[in-house]
Amino acid sequence: MTTVARVARGGWDVESASTPIANRARIEQVETNVDAPTTPEMLFDSALELRHESGVALRFEAEDALREWVKLGLPAIEVAAAKTWRRSHVERFGDASIAATRDARGGEGVGTSADGADGAALPPGPSMTSWNTTERSAEYDWTFTTPYGGTVTTTSDSNRQPPTWELTDRRIDRAMLTERDPILMYDELTLYESELDDNGVAHLGLKVRVMPKCWFVLLRFWLRVDGVLIRLFETRFFCDFTEVDRTGAVVVVRETQRREETWDALHARGAPCDPTQFPDADQAASVLLAAGGPVDIVTHALTIAP
């Protein structure tokens, strides 16, 4: 059952929809739409949309996030388990590209001698103890890492072009976010998640909060490949209803922080390397922040003319 939350404030109409896991037909449709070889096991049609009275909207959804994953095309992580993971994933969830992969590899694929004499399914992927850097899977980035930063659109009855994100020296007003104002709306959504066949987790989700003077969104992609690396992309969006420039324009600030650490680098700095220490994005963020590793930060502004 779909659960909807909605509030209107400061010229914005904010609406979130939380849905069950998508069915197979919807998953296949997404794979076709974004030209993806597969999708995460848990894919949701949940979405958040923030519509401004000018007709400009900022939307967050799994399909567009996966489209950005395909475009990014990161090289696959070099682990011995990668190919086995992919093939067992295909056995369990399907993969429209398997026929092409089999042909390209001279017949190696599901249902061939590579799987067993009787074409039986492969067992689940190996445990974390088998991860190493001795073999490269060149199929695709099976971690579903996405640089997604939301989708900017305009309503169908608007003749304007969607505004674009521009680099800025503006900052999110964190003091305003800590004020004891009432929370008019709060929601958390999962857009997609994969357990990487018990070898870690990849998760994309968001939190939204609307208050009397502003709204705030935290979009997080986080990845844990056990024994290999931790990756965390955090993108924060903020709009102050009380701030309008001299032209009457409204500004949305987007701050992106990207952190990535190998298991070895964390261990060298004394950080915990037990997967149980990273059960979710909140814990991963705390450990990575405490470890003091490298972080890339960039800030953009979206100016919405009246």
Which stretches of residues belong to each language-model region?
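Intrinsically disordered, low-complexity segments enriched in small/polar residues
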Residues: 8-9, 53, 71, 92, ...
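Residue-level detector of high-confidence beta-strand sites
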Residues: 17, 57-61, 220, 232
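Generic detector of ordered, mature protein regions
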Residues: 20, 25-27, 63, 234, ...
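Amphipathic, interaction-prone secondary-structure segments
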Residues: 28-65, 207-210
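Short linear, low-complexity motifs centered on an aromatic residue
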Residues: 61-82
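A eukaryote-biased signal for long
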Residues: 130-306
